[in-house]
Amino acid sequence: AVKSGAKFNKDMILAQMKEFYTQCELYEMTGCVHTAKLFVSEDKFYIGEDIAQHNTIDKAVGKAVLDGANLANSFLMVSGRLSSEMVVKAVMHGIPALISRTAPTSLGVVIARKFELTLCGFARGENINVYSGEERIYE
């Protein structure tokens, strides 16, 4: 299970999601890649871009690990759907929350609940759907 006392403000998450899409440089140039952003603190984040969505997490987390970042209070934003594989990657790295502007798969939700990962989808505008780990999100 993901053990973390991290709490995340809903408005801060939505602001970071909005900013996230301004930081997807390769997507802006090509229109055909996925992006992941690992948010560690207001001034520390790591971006991973790749044509394969799963690789974006590996790239962002790899940069953070090489930099010695503590992931216990971080959250991960991804550009695509929240599949079971994406959820497993977040759990394996001890990242407490995984967020996307799109939907989770049903198996992704089951795994997130089993391993106490906060899973949020449709994070856009002023809305966010929390599918598991509601206790980490506050107004």
Residue ranges, per PLM feature:
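Short beta->alpha transition motifs characteristic of CBS
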Residues: 49-51
